[in-house]
Swiss-Prot record:
This is 2,3-bisphosphoglycerate-dependent phosphoglycerate mutase. It catalyses: (2R)-2-phosphoglycerate = (2R)-3-phosphoglycerate. The gene is gpmA. Catalyzes the interconversion of 2-phosphoglycerate and 3-phosphoglycerate. GO terms for biological process: gluconeogenesis; glycolytic process. It is an enzyme of class 5 (isomerase). One of its GO terms (molecular function) is phosphoglycerate mutase activity. Residues 116-135 are annotated as: Disordered. It holds the Pfam family His_Phos_1. The active site is at H9 (tele-phosphohistidine intermediate), E87 (proton donor/acceptor). The record marks H182 as: Transition state stabilizer. PANTHER family: PHOSPHOGLYCERATE MUTASE (PTHR11931).
Length: 250
């Protein structure tokens, strides 16, 4: 049996402000740092030990990973960064407050933009200063690989090659891996692993800073999955994520 540990980054400054973040490179809040440290403490207390770590190229995920590994006394661990693990790109919504956007366009439309499988938000203009196409960290990518918007389907299509070419072979080689990423890049992996339908994925929310453990068979098919720590607290945190895009907070 293999194990895979997935951690959504701790609370970011734009999570706190209830803004659409996407590829915008915002930092963790003090709460987010505490969540990341708590994840590391949970993993250490449960006897987890890793050989390899993966994260995105966005600081809220990379710093979450660092705090996790620091609490585990494993900051020396090899870490591979990949843009393919970045958050889903939210296009022209990036930087906007989710509740205010829902008041303007309606809860239903914002839910479609946030959680539907194949409907992207309105794109950024190519010359929009919020675009990442001139960012050095993406200099080796083809222009079309740096998105102006994405739906979850697009996110799945960029995450799965990294799973197939890097993560899955490492797991099968016996490497114990931890992944610190983002709500939608983790949703993409969970959709694939659990074979969740395009319609059912709408209801899946990933809470900040709580380790999600997958136990996998020899073919990397899930035997079971669970959040470490207080399962009721994890469920409440996931429900809170789902309520972020409503005009009136739930």
């Amino acid at each position: 049996m293999y194990k895979l540990v997935l951690i959504r980054h701790g609370e970011s400054t734009w999570n706190l402000d209830n803004r659409f973040t996407g590829w915008t490179d915002v930092d963790l809040t003090e709460t987010g740092i505490a969540q990341a440290k708590n994840s590391g403490q949970l993993l250490k207390a449960e006897g987890y030990d890793f050989d390899l770590a993966y994260t995105s190229v966005l600081k809220r995920a990379t710093r979450t990973l660092w705090h996790v590994l620091d609490e585990m006394d494993q900051t020396w661990l090899p870490v591979e960064h990949s843009w393919r693990l970045n958050e889903r790109h939210y296009g022209d919504l990036q930087g906007l407050n989710k509740a205010e956007t829902a008041k303007k366009f309606g809860d239903e439309q914002v839910l479609v933009w946030r959680r539907s499988y194949d409907t992207p938000p309105p794109p950024l203009a190519a010359n929009d200063p919020r675009s990442e196409r001139s960012d050095r960290r993406y200099a080796n990518l083809l222009p079309g690989q740096v998105p102006l918007t994405e739906c979850l389907k697009d996110t799945v299509e960029r995450v799965l090659p990294f799973w197939n070419e890097a993560m899955a072979p490492a797991i099968k080689a016996g490497k114990r891996i931890v992944v610190a990423a983002h709500g939608n890049s983790i949703r993409a992996l969970v959709k694939y692993l659990d074979n969740i339908s395009d319609s059912d994925i709408v209801g899946l929310n990933i809470p900040n800073g709580i380790p999600l453990v997958y136990e996998l068979d020899e073919n990397l098919k899930p035997l079971r999955s669970y959040y470490l720590g207080d399962s009721e607290a994890a469920a409440k945190a996931a429900a809170a994520v789902g309520a972020q895009g409503k005009a009136v907070a739930a």
